[in-house]
Amino acid sequence: MSQAELNGELFTLERFPPNAEEEALQAWEAADEYLLQQVNDVDGLTLIFNDGFGALACALAERNPVSINDSFISELATRHNLRMNGIDEESVRFQDSLSPLPAAPALVLIKVPKQLALLEQQLRALREVVTPETRIIAAAKARDVHNSTLALFEKILGTTTTSLAWKKARLIHCVFTAPKLADAPQTYSWKLDGTPWTIHNHANVFARSGLDIGARFFLQHLPSDLEGEIADLGCGNGVIGLQALAQNPNASVMFTDESHMAVASSRLNVERNLPDDIARCEFMVNNSLSGIEPDRFTAILCNPPFHQQHAITDHIAWQMFNDARRSLKYGGELYVVGNRHLDYFRKLKRAFGNCTTIATNNKFVILKATKVRKQR
């Protein structure tokens, strides 16, 4: 938790979920400050894209902005920081990146996302609603503004210029000129080797153009013939849960992720590949397993992320492991795949009191931890 002066006011801002070990990481950056220096002469409907922890929404709450994000955790972070600063949450309208945008905004502020495909999807959505009078400004660390970034703005929206760097941040200014643009598919699709399935990914889903090598390894070692409920935690495009659905015909599968596009991709992949099994599925956008009742699942399958936006972190994995222990039935099992260097074995041993190595190769390890009653 720290204080930031934004738009002439002092705000207390915190990363989310709160994590004492990462207090050195700020919930805002120079790119936020730089953006806010540009907006005081613009009135009207304001759209904010990819506001990681709500710094922009807090500073501009009096405008009643619309905050658009694929990340549910970013929405939770924004709500948390609004409350911490005594700002009514209802002053900001939240929507995900797949929902239609409001028409004719006066001001569009974009924090350039890590995934260029997500930026393209958002710019294409903006193309449908902006006007030549709309002020469009994007910002990022200077090192993250590439020629390819500028070319995307130019191709989709129109005339694009960039600013000088300030505190290692850079702005992108864009004027909508409606350049000719070929249509693009709504999802990326590819065949999953060894199956009749075609996998469909929305723009912000990890490994959208093919199966990542960690998931490929994990697919070879999933449990079979289970009953009860299985969770695909951090489901991404749902390929792990899809295979679990096929291998466990007497079980149901929950697909859950903090990315709206991930959960939408998972639903689409079940609908397209195993439509007769959709009744055995649940799809949930969530912060890990928050709010899920204890002692529910027979098994949880997890490939934890170790990045939050641009920061490397292990607190998301810790949260997933602890949530999994709470949500598993006694005797239930958590299966985890991860890079060997992340040392998940030690973390799982600490969280569960036990851990078994299922398989390993030169890069990845698959681990299993069982929920057991603690010895008195």
Curated annotation (Swiss-Prot):
SUPFAM superfamilies linked to this entry: S-adenosyl-L-methionine-dependent methyltransferases
Organism this protein belongs to: Klebsiella pneumoniae (strain 342)
Main location group: cytoplasm
Alphabetical UniProt keywords: Cytoplasm, Methyltransferase, rRNA processing, S-adenosyl-L-methionine, Transferase
Compartments, as annotated in UniProt: Cytoplasm
Coiled-coil segments on the chain, per record: none
Family: Belongs to the methyltransferase superfamily. RlmG family.
HAMAP family according to UniProt: 23SrRNA_methyltr_G
Reaction(s) catalysed (UniProt annotation): guanosine(1835) in 23S rRNA + S-adenosyl-L-methionine = N(2)-methylguanosine(1835) in 23S rRNA + S-adenosyl-L-homocysteine + H(+)
Gene designation: rlmG
Keyword S-adenosyl-L-methionine: yes
CC per GO annotation: cytoplasm
InterPro entries associated with the record: DNA_methylase_N6_adenine_CS, rRNA_m2G-MeTrfase_RlmG, RsmC/RlmG, SAM-dependent_MTases_sf, Small_mtfrase_dom
Enzyme Commission (EC) number: 2.1.1.174
Reported function: Specifically methylates the guanine in position 1835 (m2G1835) of 23S rRNA.
Protein name: Ribosomal RNA large subunit methyltransferase G
EC class name: transferase
